[in-house]
UniProtKB/Swiss-Prot annotation:
Residues 98-271, 407-682 are annotated as: Disordered. Residues 150-161 are annotated as: Involved in CYFIP1- and NCKAP1-binding. Residues 112-122, 151-167, 187-202, 230-240, 255-264, 449-468, 520-538, 667-682 have a biased composition (Polar residues). This is Neuronal tyrosine-phosphorylated phosphoinositide-3-kinase adapter 2. Pfam families: NYAP_C, NYAP_N. Interacts with ACOT9, ARHGAP26 and PIK3R2. Interacts with components of the WAVE1 complex, CYFIP1 and NCKAP1; this interaction mediates PI3K-WAVE1 association and actin cytoskeleton remodeling. Residues 489-510 have a biased composition (Low complexity). The keyword Phosphoprotein applies. It comes from Mus musculus. The modification Phosphotyrosine is found at residue 300. InterPro entries: NYAP1/NYAP2, NYAP_C, NYAP_N. The modification Phosphoserine is found at residues 120, 238, 463. GO terms for biological process: neuron projection morphogenesis; phosphatidylinositol 3-kinase/protein kinase B signal transduction. The modification Omega-N-methylarginine is found at residue 81.
Amino acid sequence: MIPSKMMSANPEEDPLDTFFQYIEDMGMKAYDGLVIQNASDIARENDRLRNETKLAYLKEKNEKRRRQEETIKRIGGEVGRGQDASYAGKHFRMGFMTMPAPQDRLPHPCSSGFTVRSQSLHSVGGTEDDSSCGSRRQPPPKPKRDPSTKLSTSSETVNSTAASKSGRSLERAEGKFTVPASHSPPRASTSGHLFPSPGSQERNIKVSAKPRPHSDEYSKKIPPPKPKRNPNTQLSTSFDETYIKKHVPRRTSLPRDSSLSQVCSPAADPEEEEPVYIEMVGNILRDFRKEEDDQSEAVYEEMKYPIFDDLGHDSKCDFDHHSCSSQCATPTVPDLDFVKSSGPCTPKGLLCDIPPPFPNLLSHRPPLLVFPPAPVHCSPNSDESPLTPLEVTKLPVLENVSYMKQPPGACPSSLPSHGSSHAKDQTGALGPAPGASILSSSPPPPSTLYRTQSPHGYPKSHSTSPSPVSMGRSLTPLSLKRPPPYDAVHSGSLSRSSSSVPHTTPRPVSQDGAKMVNAAVNTYSAAQSGSRSRTPTSPLEELTSLFTSGRSLLRKSSSGRRSKEPAEKSTEELKVRSHSTEPLPKLDSKERGHYGSSSSREPVKAQEWDGTPGPPVVTSRMGRCSVSPTLLAGNHSSEPKVSCKLGRSASTSGVPPPSVTPLRQASDLQQSQVPSSLANRD
């Protein structure tokens, strides 16, 4: 700037100023050029360095690759290109390139199924046959065994010294080949032994374990067998222990197994691996055979012991369980059939035929199942009006002609209305018997089945319990019998009306009940009043009372039945009128006759229910008297007709009687019916 000012001041100085300016500009240009050159040089240098390093890295990489390839090629030449297969995992290119070679040689190896290693071994053997480098030829098998190169190198080094000689001598000792180790067959055999056959392995182990360096590999392999042996021995021992506990004969089988395993394995150490498995397998097979023999112990073990318990139970409580099972309203049709066909003792045998768990369940279940069985036999349809005609027809089947005429006449009016309800109640109270008797042209046999069922099932179940099913069906004969006769007398007129009422179970019994009650009220009012007070409120109480009074009742019932028989016929006729009720009482009396001797409890229940039901109910509590049945029978013969008439009128009137009255009437009716059934039976 100064020069410019000066120039401005002194125009002469302009050339100098311009000169300086020019110099300055040139210097700046040179400087800029240098800077740029420097920068470019620096950049170029950096690029060069970068490229050099990169190239060096690439060169190193390439060199490494080249070396690897060279080594692979060299190894392939020595061991055979099959060896490349082992490297295939590491060096993909070479592996793929060389892979075809081992594949081409696949036919050579004895075991083409082996992995690439085994193939490579065999292929190596083939190549080595061409090249006579014995020391190198032996090592390849080891790499096959262990694909690690270290093993091969170590084997090579060792083999170079004495391994080749020892290997040859060993192979000769084996007797496989006297050919020097350079030949592939011995090598293949040694290498093959590792994989294919335990026998060859044992030989290799024995021969090479001591002199060969391979012994290290063998020793490595040997330890695993030992653990196998130990676990196997433990397994076998635990196996044996568990089975020895269960079956002593197992011990004999174990020695057998050990001997077999020893026989199978000429060389104990190497083959113990397999023998162990063989031993285990043999034991298992033997165990399975034994288990087949003792299926109950193993497969059905759980069921087997329960079965024995059940058998013991049955033998001990023969009568108890069977009376209970048959008595329990659990009456399955088969149960009833059994009882009917084979008598009191047969039910047990038949029950035993059923798989063991079921009889036990039935014996314990009965009180709960009491009600269902009745429904099963008394289908809802059977309870309904359609049964009324069946009942009417059933009366003729019963063959009480004189009274049957009356029931149809008297019942026609009442039967239509309450006939269905009557049938329901009767079927319900009597249990499945009514339906069966109705359906069967010959009521007595089915009734016999059902009678056993009803006396046992109902007394035991004591369907007096208020459950709706029990209300409909389960008014047990006991409950019906027990109510005091004097109540029944009053309800005699109401019985029919009550029967018209759909839910009053006693109605069906009430007709006959009223008749019987009128006859027996005078004689038994006092006794039954006592018994009524005793009538159990709950099924359990009834059961307890039944069992307590059972034995005494059984003794007295036999005499009671005999006394009742003469007069029972008239009562039986009355029972015929009570269509659905009658078949059961008859059956009860029959069954009582059959079962009285066979099972104490069954007869007791049957007698309570059947033979002595009316008064005996009282007497059963009080001690049954043979006289009461006779009196009852006499009363029945004299008064039942009147009571029936009353019952019909009441039913016609449709006056609903108290439920208690129907129950009492039913009880009276059943009482009278039981003697009548006894008479019919006799």
